[in-house]
Structure formats: C-alpha cells, structure tokens
Amino acid sequence: MKLTWILVADNVHVRIFTVDTPSSALEEIEGFTHTESRLHDREMTTDLPGRIKSDGGSGHALEQKTDPKKHEADNFAHYIARYLEAAYNSNKYEQLLIIAEPTFLGLLRNCLAKNILKQVCFDLDKNITQHSAADIRKHLPEYLTNH
C-alpha cells in the first residue's frame, strides 16, 4: 500500500493521520493550530478603519481592503501547502486524502502545488477537525485503495 496521509482541516486546526493497511484505523501523526485565526478582527489589525468627511459635512467610514480572518485563513492554507510539499518531497507520503471545512478546502486547493494536487485521491468538504479518529475514519472510503 502507498504511504497515505489523511489531512483533516479548518482555518484554525490541521490534523494529519496515516493508516497501516487499506482498512485500518487512523493514527494521528501531526497537528497544527493557527491561533491567529481565532482572534477577533480588532485584535488582528493595528488600526480601526478611518472616517472621511464629504463636502456635505457628513462622514463615511472607510472599510478595510481585506477581511483579517480571511487573510489569516489564507496564510494558514499557504503554510499547510508548503508543509505538504516539503513532506511529499521527503517521501513521507505518496497519496493524500483531504477532509476540510468547505471554505478552507477551497483556499487550500488554491495553494497546493500541481504535483501535490496530483496526489490527492479523495476530498470531502466537511468540518470534522474536533471529531475522534474513529469518527473521521467513518467519513473515508471503507477500503483505501492506491491512487
């Protein structure tokens, strides 16, 4: 059986599991927490949006160009993508299964290198990072085949 990693993720947590045989239980081998994604918007930015006055004397609030939470989720997705590429290049896995919160799954897909995307043999848009390994296993194909 190919070396298989199962990545379970959201914008705050990533858990990586492996399996010994195609039908065996999951074994957690790595975990990451991105605490910045837990912060409130006001804690992520140094300044509040400003205000401008128009000719009529009324003011208008200026909006931030980017959403701080989305920015942090994107940073985390890039970090995980780089980690997955380095691990693949070090022959730590040969095929990858991904279960991720829908928005984070989209961010992660956009960050993954083409050679890593080719190794993805299963993905599911579901947020189950807080579930037990046994419960996560139930969301995967019963028999993990070689990609």
Predicted regions, residues:
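Terminal alpha-helical anchor/extension segments at protein ends
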Residues: 1-147
